[in-house]
């Protein structure tokens, strides 16, 4: 299940308290974000050892700025509290490869 983050404090807490976190930085008005959302949700059900969250770039702008997000969707992988990988764009196969790289 994908959790929607609503504050900087919540984002920081999730990132620091979980070994592997995949973050989808999205916007409600973003067509590609909407297109890949069901696939991201499916991945959260398949790869249950990872935490999947979403951050609305317009609603939680402090996280967006801190993480230097400039395009949507942007997917970031956090391992033990640190950003370790980034994927730009709504590419299902590239997102699956990114997730599988860290799921192993």
From Swiss-Prot:
UniProt xrefs under SUPFAM superfamilies: Thioredoxin-like (SSF52833)
Taxonomy, superkingdom: Eukaryota
UniProt xrefs under Pfam families: Thioredoxin
Disulfide bonds: 30-33
Site label Contributes to redox potential value, positions: 31-32
InterPro entries linked to this entry: Thioredoxin, Thioredoxin-like_sf, Thioredoxin_CS, Thioredoxin_domain
Residues the UniProt record annotates as site (Deprotonates C-terminal active site Cys): 24
Record PTM: The disulfide bond between Cys-30 and Cys-33 acts as a redox-active center and is reduced by thioredoxin reductase TRXR.
All residue ranges annotated as the Thioredoxin domain in the record: 2-104
Keyword tags: Cytoplasm, Disulfide bond, Electron transport, Redox-active center, Transport
Protein name (Swiss-Prot/TrEMBL): Thioredoxin 1
Organism of this sequence: Plasmodium falciparum (isolate 3D7)
Gene behind this protein: TRX1
